[in-house]
Swiss-Prot record:
This is Chalcone synthase 7. Belongs to the thiolase-like superfamily. Chalcone/stilbene synthases family. It catalyses: (E)-4-coumaroyl-CoA + 3 malonyl-CoA + 3 H(+) = 2',4,4',6'-tetrahydroxychalcone + 3 CO2 + 4 CoA. The primary product of this enzyme is 4,2',4',6'-tetrahydroxychalcone (also termed naringenin-chalcone or chalcone) which can under specific conditions spontaneously isomerize into naringenin. The keyword Acyltransferase applies. Pathway: Secondary metabolite biosynthesis; flavonoid biosynthesis. Its EC number is 2.3.1.74. PROSITE patterns: CHALCONE_SYNTH. GO terms for molecular function: naringenin-chalcone synthase activity. It comes from the Eukaryota. The keyword Calcium does not apply. Keywords: Acyltransferase, Flavonoid biosynthesis, Transferase. The active site is at C168. It comes from Sorghum bicolor.
Length: 400
C-alpha cells in the first residue's frame, strides 16, 4: 500500500489564501413601507390604542425628536397590526403571529439584498462557497440560511452558518467569521447576509418599561449583504475594503446593560441608561489594541463605521476620542435615513461610505483615508472591532 505523498503542512498551505479577506460587493434592501419619524408618535399611540396615555405620548415624542432619525422602513403595516391586536398590546401572547411573519420575510428581505450584491460582484452564483446568515428576528429550523440557499438557487453543497439572536454587534461578527472563512479556504467566496425585521419586537407602550419605548423609537427594518473573498481576480472582481483584523470583547462591569429575551410576548428589550457611557469609557482600549500595532494613534486619520445604536452613543464616543464631526458622517446618515437596523447597520454604512467617497472624488473607498475601523456594539455588552483598509477608487467602483 502506497503511503501519502504530501504532508499535513503542505495540505494546509495549499488550503490557505495568500492575501487578506476583501469585501467585493455590497447590496442593501428595505421593506417598501416607509415611516417618517415626525409622524410616528401619533401613529404608534393610535395603532396601539394608547392615545389616553397623554403624558407617556409626550415622553415618546421627545424620544423620537432626540433620535436624529428622519425615517425608517417597517414591514409591519397598519392593516396587519389591525388584524393582530395582540402585537399592539404591551405584553399579550403573540409569538406565533410574529414568527409567522419573520420566518417568511427575513429570508425574503435577505434575498433582495443578496441579489444586489451578487449582481454587483458580477460572478456566477455557483462560485459562492459559503453562506453566513445573521438575524435577531425570530428562529426556525431549517433556518433562514437554508431558505435563502433555496431562494437564490445556490449549490446544495454551499457551506452554511446560521447565526440567530446575536443582536446589534453582529454586523462585526459576520465580517470576522467571513474573514476567517475566506482566508482559510483558498478560492472561497462568502455570501454574508444580515436581515432584520422589527415584527418580533413591536409592542405597545408601558409606563413601567420605558427602555422598551426607546427601542420603539429607534429600530427599523433592513437587510444587507456582502461578498467576501481573498485574492480577488482583478479582471472580474472589484475590491472595496480589506478586512485586516477582527476581534470581540465583553466590556467590564456591563452585564445586563443590554438584554433581549424571546418569550411568548415576542422579543423583549431591556436597556440600562448608561450604555453610552460604558461604550465610550472602553472605546479607547479597543482602538489602542487594534491600531497600536499599525503605529496609528490619531483616530481622526482613519475612517469610521460605528453601529448607530442611538445618537447618545455616537455623541459620547466622539467626545471621548476627540473625533471631528465628519468622521461619523456616514454613520449618522444611515441612522437618519434608516434608524437602528441591528446587525445590518454597519454594512449599510460601508455601502454609504464607498458610494459617497466615489461621488465626492475621494482617492479611496474610505473617504480618502487608507485605514479605518468598524465597531459593532450590542448585548453583553459585546464589542466587535474590525480593522479595515480601503482601496483606491477606480472607474469600476464609481459605476457600481
Amino acid at each position: 500500500m502506497a503511503g501519502a505523498t504530501v504532508t499535513v503542512e503542505e495540505v494546509r498551505k495549499a488550503q490557505r489564501a495568500t492575501g487578506p479577506a476583501t469585501v467585493l460587493a455590497i447590496g442593501t434592501a428595505t421593506p417598501a413601507n416607509c415611516v417618517h419619524q415626525a409622524d410616528y408618535p401619533d401613529y404608534y399611540f393610535r395603532i396601539t390604542k394608547s392615545e389616553h396615555m397623554t403624558d407617556l405620548k409626550e415622553k415618546f415624542k421627545r424620544m423620537c425628536d432626540k433620535s436624529q432619525i428622519r425615517k425608517r422602513y417597517m414591514h409591519l403595516t397598519e392593516e396587519y397590526l389591525a388584524e393582530n391586536p395582540n402585537m399592539c398590546a404591551y405584553m399579550a401572547p403573540s409569538l406565533d403571529a410574529r414568527q409567522d411573519i419573520v420566518v417568511v420575510e427575513v429570508p425574503k428581505l435577505g434575498k433582495a439584498a443578496a441579489q444586489k450584491a451578487i449582481k454587483e460582484w458580477g460572478q456566477p452564483k455557483s462560485k459562492i462557497t459559503h453562506l453566513v446568515f445573521c438575524t435577531t428576528s425570530g428562529v426556525d429550523m431549517p433556518g433562514a440560511d437554508y431558505q435563502l440557499t433555496k431562494m437564490l438557487g445556490l449549490r446544495p453543497s454551499v457551506n452554511r452558518l446560521m447565526m440567530y439572536q446575536q443582536g446589534c454587534f453582529a454586523g462585526g461578527t459576520v465580517l470576522r467569521v467571513a474573514k476567517d472563512l475566506a482566508e482559510n479556504n483558498r478560492g472561497a467566496r462568502v455570501l454574508v447576509v444580515c436581515s432584520e425585521i422589527t415584527a418580533v419586537t413591536f409592542r405597545g407602550p408601558s409606563e413601567s418599561h420605558l427602555d422598551s419605548m426607546v427601542g420603539q423609537a429607534l429600530f427599523g427594518d433592513g437587510a444587507a449583504a456582502v461578498i467576501v473573498g481573498a485574492d480577488p481576480d482583478k479582471r472580474v472582481e472589484c475590491p472595496l475594503f480589506q478586512l485586516v483584523s477582527a476581534s470581540q470583547t465583553i466590556l467590564p462591569d456591563s452585564e445586563g446593560a443590554i438584554d433581549g429575551h424571546l418569550r411568548e410576548v415576542g422579543l423583549t428589550f431591556h436597556l440600562l441608561k448608561d450604555v453610552p457611557g460604558l461604550i465610550s469609557k472602553n472605546i479607547e482600549r479597543s482602538l489602542e489594541e487594534a491600531f497600536k500595532p499599525l503605529g496609528i494613534t490619531d483616530y481622526n486619520s482613519i475612517f469610521w463605521v460605528a453601529h448607530p445604536g442611538g445618537p447618545a452613543i455616537l455623541d459620547q464616543v466622539e467626545a471621548k476620542v476627540g473625533l471631528k464631526k465628519e468622521r461619523m458622517r456616514a454613520t449618522r446618515h444611515v441612522l437618519s435615513e434608516y434608524g437602528n437596523m441591528s446587525s445590518a447597520c454597519v454594512l449599510f454604512i460601508l455601502d454609504e461610505m464607498r458610494k459617497r467617497s466615489a461621488e465626492e472624488g475621494q482617492a479611496t473607498t474610505g473617504e480618502g483615508f487608507d485605514w479605518g475601523v468598524l465597531f459593532g456594539f450590542g448585548p453583553g455588552l459585546t464589542v466587535e472591532t474590525v480593522v479595515l483598509h480601503s482601496v483606491p477608487i477606480t472607474i469600476a467602483a464609481i459605476t457600481a
